[in-house]
Amino acid sequence: MKKNITKTIIASTVIAAGLLTQTNDAKAFFSYEWKGLEIAKNLADQAKKDDERIDKLMKESDKNLTPYKAETVNDLYLIVKKLSQGDVKKAVVRIKDDGPRDYYTFDLTRPLEENRKNIKVVKNGEIDSITWY
């Protein structure tokens, strides 16, 4: 009888430990998935805000019949991405400047790097030409 009680206690302990481990794994997995959903939602919200902002800039330029203007490199990237058609992989944007640093090159197959997003565009930021490759 003593052996059966000991076996039952040991078995109960093993089962309880297994359930606790599974519960913790499930919590960790759920937490990981939840964070992934939050990140995806934040990225979608940011993309929507960027799209609205670029639409506003482009409509304003179209209305005034002026060249597209960009304040930051991120604005340039989003304008080029919006104007690109087909299977375009790279774009070179020339700014009206007549200076040595009036070209910006973008790889449209990848998102813009974080360290380039807030760089100010030279001169007034008017786009002279865009060449796609």
Curated annotation (Swiss-Prot):
Q: Name one GO cellular component term.
A: extracellular region
Transmembrane residue ranges: none
Q: Which GO terms describe its biological process?
A: symbiont-mediated suppression of host signal transduction pathway via antagonism of host cell surface receptor
* Gene3D superfamilies noted in UniProt: Chemotaxis-inhibiting protein CHIPS (3.10.20.390)
Q: What UniProt keywords apply to this chain's record, in alphabetical order?
A: Secreted, Signal, Virulence
For whether the record's keyword set contains Signal, the answer is yes
Cite a single Pfam family from the UniProt record. FPRL1_inhibitor
Signal sequence span per UniProt? 1-28
Subcellular localization(s) per the UniProt record: Secreted
**Source taxon at top rank:** Bacteria
Q: Would I find Phosphoprotein among this entry's keywords?
A: no
Q: List the disulfide bonds.
A: none
Location, primary (coarse class): secreted
Q: Which family does it belong to?
A: Belongs to the CHIPS/FLIPr family.
Please explain the role this protein plays, according to its UniProt record: May be involved in countering the first line of host defense mechanisms. Impairs the leukocyte response to FPRL1 agonists by binding directly to host FPRL1. Exerts, in vitro, anti-inflammatory activity by inhibiting calcium mobilization and cell migration toward chemoattractants.
Name the record gives this protein: FPRL1 inhibitory protein
The species is Staphylococcus aureus (strain Newman)
